[in-house]
């Protein structure tokens, strides 16, 4: 199965490539259309690639930053749509959700998404009424945390699992906890949330604690394509992150992490899945690094099984 996806995920590929119908070259290659965010933050791409692998097919995609959607084309060429994964309930995507709720006549599958409520955002999430309406119509719905369920007052029994990212990493890398404690720390930075003054402070604290420091913005570039960034996580002993997907990727590799939260979704992930600790200020980092509590393992095998189980449910229906 993995060879089927080599062209979109390879050390030789400069950037992840998807058949993005919204770019104008409308060459239909699948019967399912997947809505995703094309921002080069790798947290947007990893769940998409994982979903393709769980369905054993490369899906056509539509970048939800580009709206309105050509519903005439969509209804003519596709039998269902997938929304996900990643933080697609961020307020910047309100226009997409309103368009989806009003105009989509196909079965909807919501998969691996969550709300984003950054501390520095005045508008918090997509309007509740729109989200509830779409979820009520969905054939299947899966979200990544209780925060999303509670914020939108969704069905208490809704499927909640870790991000599909876990499956992509398990399918493409060796996943194993390091047997010997090392000194390599990867700082995964959210450039939009992490204050400018905080970045060098995090580096200083890590180095003064005796660790070897490396850095990623989790943004795919020609110099740092997806696989190269993921190799940095695999090589690290520990991860310090201000990004949710920094914690998710660390968890997927069984690397202990310390998450510094500038958005409650980070704490929501840590609460559900463990595998590290969550702090709310850089001032707490020195103490957190000196305390082995962040090294307590999560229940990775149980959680990835639950991700795969939801994938199997959708695959059987499609």
Locate predicted features.
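Active-site anion-handling motifs in enzyme catalytic cores
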Residues: 1-318
């Amino acid at each position: 199965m993995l060879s089927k996806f080599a062209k979109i995920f390879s050390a030789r590929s400069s950037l992840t490539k998807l058949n993005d119908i919204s770019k104008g070259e409308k060459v239909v290659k699948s019967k399912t259309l997947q809505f995703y965010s094309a921002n080069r933050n790798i947290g947007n791409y990893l769940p998409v690639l994982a979903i393709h692998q769980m369905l054993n097919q490369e899906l056509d995609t539509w970048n939800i930053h580009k709206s309105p959607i050509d519903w005439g084309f969509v209804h003519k060429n596709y039998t269902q749509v997938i929304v996900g994964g990643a933080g697609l309930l961020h307020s910047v995507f309100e226009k997409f959700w309103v368009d989806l709720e009003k105009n989509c006549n196909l079965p909807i599958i919501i998969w691996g998404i969550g709300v984003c409520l950054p501390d520095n955002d005045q508008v918090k999430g997509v309007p509740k009424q729109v989200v509830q309406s779409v979820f009520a119509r969905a054939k299947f719905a899966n979200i990544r945390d209780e925060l999303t369920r509670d914020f939108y007052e969704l069905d208490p029994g809704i499927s909640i699992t870790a991000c599909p990212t876990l499956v992509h990493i398990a399918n493409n890398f060796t996943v194993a906890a390091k047997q010997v404690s090392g000194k390599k720390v990867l700082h995964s930075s959210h450039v939009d949330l992490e204050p400018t003054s905080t970045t060098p402070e995090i580096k200083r604290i890590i180095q003064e604690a005796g660790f070897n420091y490396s850095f990623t913005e989790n943004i795919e570039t020609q110099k740092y394509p997806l696989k190269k960034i993921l190799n940095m996580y695999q090589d690290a002993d520990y991860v310090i992150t201000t990004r949710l997907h920094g914690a998710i990727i660390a968890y997927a590799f069984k690397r202990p992490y310390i998450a510094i939260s500038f958005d409650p979704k980070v704490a929501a992930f840590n609460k559900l899945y463990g595998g590290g600790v969550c702090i709310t200020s850089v001032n707490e980092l020195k103490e957190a690094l000196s305390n082995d509590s962040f090294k307590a393992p999560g229940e990775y095998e149980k959680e990835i099984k639950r991700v795969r189980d939801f994938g199997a449910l959708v695959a059987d229906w499609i």
